[in-house]
């Protein structure tokens, strides 16, 4: 898992530790590793050394937001590392408007994926 720098850490804002993320999903902490391997979820090492998951990756019902897996797959297939993908998801994009992660929480994942796919060209 990637380590991120303080500016990227600040972009995200709210974080969940791995035990908190597992609790939010209602699964044992060990199952998170499979979600990371399957690219359904992304965790990074924060500047303070803790492993964490952005809280924005979860909806109000305790599930991973719709479309995150597909977007992560597209970004990683484009050659992004975990830290770069995280930074892209939380950086404002005037064409959306807002950040890609905000658009995904508003069910505009198709728009986000189109922009992510365009990065490959």
Residue ranges and their predicted role:
Residues 1-121:
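Non-transmembrane "mature" sequence context
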């Amino acid at each position: 898992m990637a380590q991120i720098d303080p500016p990227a850490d600040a972009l995200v804002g709210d974080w969940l530790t791995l035990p908190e993320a597992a609790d939010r999903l209602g699964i044992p902490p060990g199952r998170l590793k499979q979600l990371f391997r399957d690219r359904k979820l992304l965790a990074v090492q924060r500047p303070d050394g803790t492993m964490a998951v952005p809280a924005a990756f979860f909806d109000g019902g305790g599930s991973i937001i719709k479309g995150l897996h597909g977007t992560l797959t597209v970004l990683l297939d484009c050659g992004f590392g975990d830290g770069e993908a995280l930074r892209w998801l939380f950086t404002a994009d005037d064409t959306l408007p807002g950040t890609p992660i905000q658009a995904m929480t508003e069910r505009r994942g198709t728009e986000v994926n189109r922009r992510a796919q365009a990065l490959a060209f």
